Each structure stands twice: as structure tokens, then as C-alpha cells.
Amino acid sequence: LLFGYSVDGGEVAVIDIAQGEGIPTEIIDALTDEQITKWAFNANFERVCLSEYLRRFYPEKFISYSTKEDSVSDYLDPSSWKCSMVWAAYMGLPLSLAGAGAVLGLEEQKLTEGKELIRYFCVPCKATKVNGGRTRNLPQHDMSKWEMFKKYNKRDVE
């Protein structure tokens, strides 16, 4: 739905995939380049999700690290990914981004609305007469929530 990123600590960009925006080619290339280190909180989640996205939309760029003996194959090579959640655990910090940020006293705290926004946009909803029988909430169903979701995504990268 959304892809937020920053290059070398620069300004955070949020790509609105759900509304047709595309990830820049240089970022796609960086995601598949094992010489470029990628950092994320819960990096394995990001790596697996991006593997699926790249296989589906950029199959010519996707490079799997798997071998025939690998039972969980066809994902981006984890060797160029670093996980700040693992680092937090190593230092005895909470394993949530919000918890680690609070303990460290980070200036930019995780937005509290996030869980509700994730439920609204990322979890199927019950079809009702009120919602027109839909089973997914899309950006056009509540643009103000969608804009807040984009801010939430940006803050997570900051």
C-alpha cells in the first residue's frame, strides 16, 4: 500500500503504491543490490514483503538467494539487511518501535493512531450495508484516514 524510505539518513519519502505511485528505479535497484545495506525495524518482515512485491511487479530485477536445499526460498538475500529491532533486543530495549523510541527518548515518537489505521486499511472488514458490502477499506473510502496513514508511515521511517 505504502513504501517509506530514506537514503543515507536523508529526507523520508513515502510512495503511495495503492494510488498508483511507483517506487523509483534507483530504489528498486538498491533493494536488489547486495552491496547496499538496508536498515529497518523488523527487517525480515520488510524483506519478505518487498520480495513478494518485486517478484510480482519487477520480476526482471528480483534476485533470489535461495538454493534447491532451501525450504523457504525465493526471497531477497538477508545478508545486506540490518535489523534495528534485533539491535534493540541485543541492548535490552523493548521489541516494539514505540517502546524502543520511548526508552531512548527519541524526539520523533511513533504515532499512536497507527494500530487503528493498520486495522482499517490492512485487515479485511466485514461487509455491511453501511459500507456498501465491501471487504477492504481503500484510500478513497476515507481520504483523511489515508493521509494520516501516510504520515504514520513517514514517522516510522524517521
Q: What feature does the model see in each segment?
A:
Residues 1:
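Entry/capping segment at the start of metal-dependent catalytic domains
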